[in-house]
From Swiss-Prot:
PANTHER family: PHENYLALANINE--TRNA LIGASE BETA SUBUNIT, PHENYLALANYL-TRNA SYNTHETASE BETA CHAIN AND LEUCINE-RICH REPEAT-CONTAINING PROTEIN 47. The gene is pheT. It catalyses: tRNA(Phe) + L-phenylalanine + ATP = L-phenylalanyl-tRNA(Phe) + AMP + diphosphate + H(+). GO terms for cellular component: phenylalanine-tRNA ligase complex. Binds 2 magnesium ions per tetramer. This is Phenylalanine--tRNA ligase beta subunit. InterPro entries: aa-tRNA-synth_II/BPL/LPL, B3/B4_tRNA-bd, DNA-bd_dom_put_sf, Fdx_antiC-bd, Fdx_antiC-bd_sf, NA-bd_OB-fold, Phe-tRNA-ligase_IIc_bsu, Phe-tRNA-ligase_IIc_bsu_bact. Gene3D superfamilies: 3.30.56.10, Bira Bifunctional Protein, Domain 2 (3.30.930.10), Ferrodoxin-fold anticodon-binding domain (3.30.70.380), Nucleic acid-binding proteins (2.40.50.140), Phenylalanyl-trna Synthetase, Chain B, domain 3 (3.50.40.10). Its EC number is 6.1.1.20. It is found in: Cytoplasm.
Amino acid sequence: MKFTLSWLKQFLETSSTVIEIAEALTAIGLEVEEVIDKAAELQKFEVAYIASTKPHPSADKLKLCDVETKSGMRQIVCGASNARAGIKVVLANIGIEIPNGKFKIKESIIRGEKSCGMLCSEEELLLASESEGIIELYEDAVVGENFTKYYGLDDPIFVINVTPNRGDALGVYGIARDLAAKGIGILKELEIPEIKSTFTSKMKLNVQDKEACPLFTFREIRNLKNKPSPDWLRKLLKNVGVKTISSLVDVTNYISYSFGQPMHAYDADRIKGGISVARHCEKCSDEAISGQQKEIAAAALQPRNDVAKFHALNGKEYLLTENDLAIKDESGIQGLAGVIGGAKSSCTDSTTNIILEAACFNAKMVAASGRRFQIDTDARYRNERNIDRNFTEKALDIATNLILSICGNGEVSEVVKFGEKEPQKKPLDFSAYYLEKITGIKLSIKEIEAILNELGFITDVKGEIIKVIAPSWRHDITILEDIAEEITRIYGYDKIESIKLPELDQDNNKLREYKRISSFKRILASKGYDEVVTNSFMSSEDAKLFAELKEELFLLNPISIGDNYMRPTILPNLLSIVSKNLARSIKDMAFFEVGPSFIDLNTEATYLTAIISGSYNNKNPHSLGRGYDIFDLKGDLELVVDYAGLSIDKCIATNGTALPQYYHPTRAVNIGLGKNLLGHFGQIHPKILKYYDINQEIFAFELNITNLPLIKAKFGKREEFAVSDFQANFRDYAFIVDQDHRVGEIISYINNFNKKLVKSVILFDIYSGDKLPESKKSIAIKIELQADDRTLTEADLNLFSQDLIAAIEQKFQGTLRE
């Protein structure tokens, strides 16, 4: 939306500067994209007069123009087709920079002839995107006068971005009303002189679809002189980019930009029989039409080969469909309602009698027709954002008065009208309490009422409640929040006090839990896992393989038949992903998910669930790789549990809790802490794999993060890892122990046996068989020994071996295998 400062001041009494107005517009939600001051760039251009012309002796398309300027006569070579003697033009003197092209004018020799300046076109001055010749000024222009002042370019232009809900801001009057409410000035009252009709129009009006056209008004005006528009009107329209055509057309454009009400002027002598508004192929119903109206409509809608063809003002022809609303007479279509007028009935310089139309059309129909034919007009832009029906007749009167004042005191008919004004909207109960509740703004009822009244709202205060009725031009005000928004934008968003957010408590358990889960994810990602996110719903058929079905976990309104149950574990979803990957020949997988599992209606736990399958090192071109095994999974789980401040060996549950049925009975274990079950890890049962059509081993762990204790110390700084400068030594041992001793417990004991020397303990063999008693097993380990302060001697190593063997014998009744 464009408008000038002088245009705004027609409706707003203000002494505010351009900058103050621009800032206020943006503050109230009418964002100023640009303020154009063309006078600054074109200040040095002046009015000149072509006294005579003659052909260039060496170029057919050039002319030698004798130009009268402020400083005297000079010769200028010009190639414009409209350059001729007797016209006022725009002169660029030597040294001036031309905006389009950014080049400076120099005294030059063109084909042997001297040229001292340049005669300019609108395109060269960036006043139009294209032009056919040099600018021709009216006779009242004075030679030597500043061009910007004469042309009205000393009037700053505001370019604002209007949101789709603010159709009322597509008129300068609506913008002035908002600025007045903001305190930028005082809104001037519209003075509309009463129009007395001098004859009764014989033009009949028939509107068949009230929903498509809720209001249609027109009046006839006769004996006019369609002369050029006055200077003030031409300047206003030119400054906002509207081409001036004639006074009749210019007035309709002025009303559209001033009040947001599109208008159209038909040449009355070209309208035959009356006006009908209908979809172009609709048949007339006896109920809707009677008498002479029936004859008019029948003629207008009579099937003909060219009835759907429409010749528009833009020179193009369109074929209308049954979805397009047309304005017709007996001879055919005269306009595409709300979008563009027709060429047949357009006003020309010789037009003396007109039909002046102001109407409201269905916004959706206008938008659909405009999109279908790709026609962008000011009328469409305003109509598809809804028109204020209660102002339409006023706009018709204002336009009539303007036409009569410019084109002579012609004869005027009464208003021919279909439809009624929009009924008053229902009141909404608003209060200062509600405003403060949703915006934080504290205002009294009187202050709220004052703002709303300035914006045109009707208010009625009843104690602490203010009944608010939105004005007819605000179609977007339907709920209390809309009213609060209106008050807030006028009060000022910048006045709302900022509230400092409370600092996060770093000791807060929720924050610590969030950080811990994030760390778990980073740990697994660093080990090559991919994170997945799956649905919390699953098929009850799948769920019963993993847990006993419970009635309360069935969904009453599942999004699909296959998602009718709350998942008891994340594993089924991950197994489905494995199955889909295998079907696409992707065999090597490692991924995890953190999400909820549902035990019953009142129990929900957050689980970290991970799966590995396939080969570990498949991407190394120098290695065939090896298949994942349970120790790979245990190592990754150990990293996670270690970060949580626990030891994996201490978390192997020994409380007799049965493994879930979907794990392999002898290749999986529970994870727990005392009596608190934390999860499970191991190999998935072959029956489950068969159900999911998986033909390779799957290893998985499930860790109940909800039950995992938060150990504060683990979030502190870890000790710096020191690397010894002395040589490491390795010793292998094989101990015979009872079958019921857990290997992990023995390795953990050795790791802590002598922390100053033991750097690592690696298990490389477990044996039980014919050479050992049935109740015994042999475990073979490699121990890395290294001191931080010296190189270990043979005596040191022998002493360590003696002490270790004795300790194993005492702790586990183990003996060194010969």
